[in-house]
């Protein structure tokens, strides 16, 4: 169709979801803990994994979707998502999944919604309640300008989870993600073609180096470059966007969760539900950190020295220094 500017996609005259939380971070960084906490704040909906938001963000970052198109679909999707949650549609009722309301004891609220009448009365109820909807994403911050732009004032809090990068590298390697992503049929990450090779979308900025690396070096590169993107994007945020961005450090969250919960409540203009202690007990928060969270540089290098060149040892040292300097601003 010609004259695309004349017919550019928009969703500017309809609005359902007005209180969005983006919950973002690397795998094993503690997102599910914070997602469960969000569900026990007043007006908080239960968190669910919906890959549509991150896939839209990825396609926009890769230049495959315009800002206008991506923004319009983001708004459509979150409004539709909230409406469906409000009538018990598309809720994950698998009892063993972390992203199921059964996991945190909120199943009765969503099961009751299944039998409720749908339609305009639901919209009126949503507008009256003004619910908070958390959107769970994976390693998008650093590539996520479109989420700020697309959601605009609807985005009330962008939470970025951080954790000891040596632990994340160790976990990524032990779980063999390098040989699962874009290779196994049950993997659903966005993939890209690079020189007739299929690579994960998040390595496109260092694809050549990634292709030459061994499996363990690929794990190092993945976390190293992700964290560099996080540091860079945060420091370049405008003050209004920085104000709604919350850095949560896993090691601090575990021992002092109320440090973050208080900030979340203030940012979202809400408070803890009367049964909030129930979820803290279920999540075993606060608690002491286990030994793996203290994975030191020396132990890490000793464990993996046979798989690391001097170059990668240098990258690890740089990453650790930069990480400690960055998180010192938030704890």
Feature-to-residue mapping (PLM):
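Hydrophobic/aromatic beta-strand patches that form the interior of the parallel beta-sheet core
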Residues: 21, 45, 157-160, 246-248
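PAPS/PAP-binding and catalytic site of the sulfotransferase fold
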Residues: 30-43, 147-148, 169-173, 247-272
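PAPS-dependent sulfation machinery
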Residues: 50-136, 196-207
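A long, hydrophobic alpha-helical segment
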Residues: 126-131, 135-151, 208-212
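Conserved phosphate-donor/acceptor-positioning beta-strand/loop module used by diverse small-molecule
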Residues: 136-139, 153-174
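Long, charge-dense
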Residues: 179-203
């Amino acid at each position: 169709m010609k004259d695309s500017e004349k017919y550019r996609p928009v969703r500017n005259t309809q609005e359902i979801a007005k209180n969005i939380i983006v919950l973002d971070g690397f795998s094993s960084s503690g997102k599910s803990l914070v997602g469960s906490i969000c569900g026990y704040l007043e007006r908080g909906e239960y968190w669910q994994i919906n890959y549509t938001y991150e896939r839209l963000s990825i396609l926009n970052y890769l230049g495959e979707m315009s800002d206008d198109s991506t923004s319009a679909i983001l708004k459509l999707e979150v409004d539709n998502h909230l409406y469906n949650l409000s009538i018990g549609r598309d809720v994950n009722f698998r009892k063993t999944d972390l992203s199921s309301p059964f996991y945190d004891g909120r199943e009765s609220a969503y099961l009751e919604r299944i039998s409720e009448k749908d339609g305009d009365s639901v919209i009126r109820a949503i507008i009256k309640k003004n619910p908070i909807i958390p959107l769970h994403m994976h390693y998008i911050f650093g590539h996520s300008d479109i989420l700020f732009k697309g959601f605009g004032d609807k985005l009330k809090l962008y939470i970025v989870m951080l954790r000891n990068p040596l632990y994340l590298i160790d976990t990524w390697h032990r779980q063999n993600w390098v040989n699962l992503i874009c290779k196994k049929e049950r993997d659903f990450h966005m993939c890209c073609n690079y020189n007739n090779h299929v690579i994960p979308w998040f390595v496109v900025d260092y694809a050549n180096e990634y292709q030459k690396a061994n499996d363990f070096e690929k794990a190092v590169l993945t976390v190293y470059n992700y964290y560099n993107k996080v540091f860079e994007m945060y420091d370049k945020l405008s003050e209004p966007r920085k104000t709604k961005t919350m850095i949560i450090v896993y090691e601090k969250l575990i021992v002092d969760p109320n440090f973050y919960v208080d900030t979340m409540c203030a940012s979202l203009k809400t408070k803890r539900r009367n049964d909030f202690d129930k979820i803290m007990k279920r999540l075993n928060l606060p608690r002491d950190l286990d030994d793996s969270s203290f994975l030191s540089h020396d132990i890490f290098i000793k464990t993996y020295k046979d798989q690391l060149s001097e170059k990668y040892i240098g990258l690890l040292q740089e990453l650790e220094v930069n990480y400690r300097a960055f998180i010192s601003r938030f704890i």
